[in-house]
From Swiss-Prot:
Disulfide bonds: none annotated. Belongs to the LicD transferase family. This is Uncharacterized protein W02B3.4. The keyword Zinc does not apply. The chain crosses the membrane at residues 5-25. GO terms for biological process: protein glycosylation. It is found in: Membrane. Keywords: Membrane, Transmembrane, Transmembrane helix.
Length: 387
């Protein structure tokens, strides 16, 4: 087996006597107080940005007021707000999200201003579940600012990224016979730790997706492979933020680095462990574009052996723009999981293979050698930390 929004308090924006104010509603409490990310360097920018937008978009936002709390989810309108262009969209209603607790407010369905999408906000899950077609789920941890009863995502660019990855993909939920195999990776605590890492990566503007054995376990059995020794996620190399590594090195993260292999432009891999909670090792791979004749023909992640040999795991062009539910936690996944899993594990992916009999650098169907680091290079690209 180879080896997450920012909550902050907006001051009253006294831009006019009727401008934005906070509502003490259950809706706001659920979306903001319980579920938002804490802290982060983008807060000052967001405050300035929102103040600017509300100064120029007050009348537009007020025109969307309703009698019950609603969430603005219309990506086109949000992008318009983010660009500080506040003309009403013509020819179509504005898409808003409404909690199913307000199903009795049937007059909303007759309001020509809106396209209604109902959602559920299950306290046992860390995502909002939209009853759209196709079904969409997004992390519930994002901050909002209120204009009357209209909740507007505070960080519009981040919300748009969530929505872009919102299409729900289901798992197969196959029964996998396992006689006497030891449970090394309890599913729920390990998934919870992985969700904490997801949140830290999101805070650093990275959008991780399941990969390797963790993708296989989710897709095949809607869970975590119980005998696996680690968890696998990937981040596109072009999205990687070195600030995250610096935060861990400065003890500003809930995770510590156990191993660091490769370079950010070649076969980069981090093995992380949580400082608290269930002890699980999580491998974070950078995923690179495979370019041939000027076109992206595949994606790949790397591996490094102790002797310096590099390995390359190739996949069809990756499309991690769908969302999955893993024990109540949202994780992003490829929209074509069967294709990626067959490429890595072969046509018999639905059969269990003990981790003890699986070689990380030879068992995969998509792995091949990819050169070798020199002894001098290995001093820089192969680091194991004992702390």
């Amino acid at each position: 087996m180879r080896k997450h929004f920012v909550l902050f308090s907006f001051p009253f924006l006294l831009l006019s006597s009727m401008l934005i104010f906070y509502q003490t509603t259950v809706f706001r409490n659920q979306l903001n107080e319980e579920n938002d990310y804490t802290g982060g360097p983008i807060v000052p920018f967001m405050k300035r940005s929102l103040a600017l937008h509300y100064q120029t978009c007050e009348s537009f936002l007020n025109s969307l007021n309703t009698t019950v709390p609603v969430l603005l989810i219309d990506v086109d309108v949000l992008k318009m707000l983010d660009e500080n262009a506040c003309n009403l969209p013509t020819g179509r209603p504005t898409k808003i999200g409404v909690d199913v607790k307000y199903l009795s407010a049937t007059w909303l369905l007759q309001d020509s201003r809106f396209e209604i999408v109902y959602y559920t906000n299950d306290t046992e899950k860390d995502f909002l579940d939209f009853r759209s077609e196709p079904r969409k789920i997004i992390p519930k941890k994002f901050s909002t600012c209120w204009v009357e009863n209209l909740a507007v995502p505070a960080d519009i660019k981040l919300f748009v990224e969530f929505w872009k990855r919102a299409k729900f993909v289901n798992c197969m939920n196959l029964h996998i016979p396992r006689a006497g195999s030891k449970v090394r990776m309890p599913a729920r605590p390990s998934s919870e730790v992985l969700s904490r890492l997801r949140d830290e990566l999101i805070e650093n503007r990275m959008f991780p997706f399941l990969n390797g054995g963790t993708l296989l376990g989710w897709y095949r059995e809607c869970s975590v492979i119980p005998h696996t020794l680690d968890m696998d996620i990937s981040v596109f190399a072009e999205d990687f933020n070195l600030n995250f590594v610096e935060q861990m090195e400065q003890n500003l993260s809930d995770f510590r680095i156990k191993r660091k292999f490769g370079m950010t432009n070649d076969s980069f891999e981090l093995t992380l462990a949580p400082k608290t909670g269930f002890k699980v090792f999580i491998d974070v791979f950078l995923m690179y574009k495979g370019v041939e004749n000027g076109s992206v023909t595949h994606h790949w992640v790397g591996g490094v052996a102790p002797d310096g040999t590099k390995y390359k795991y190739s996949y069809p062009v990756y499309d991690p723009f769908c969302a999955a539910d893993l024990h109540g936690h949202i994780f992003w996944v490829t929209c074509t999981p069967n294709e990626k899993i067959v490429k890595e594990y072969g046509q018999l992916w639905y059969l269990d293979h003990l981790t003890s009999k699986y070689s990380w650098n030879s068992s995969g169907k998509n792995v091949k050698k990819n050169g070798k680091w020199t002894k001098e290079q290995m001093k820089m690209v192969y680091k194991v930390f004992k702390r």
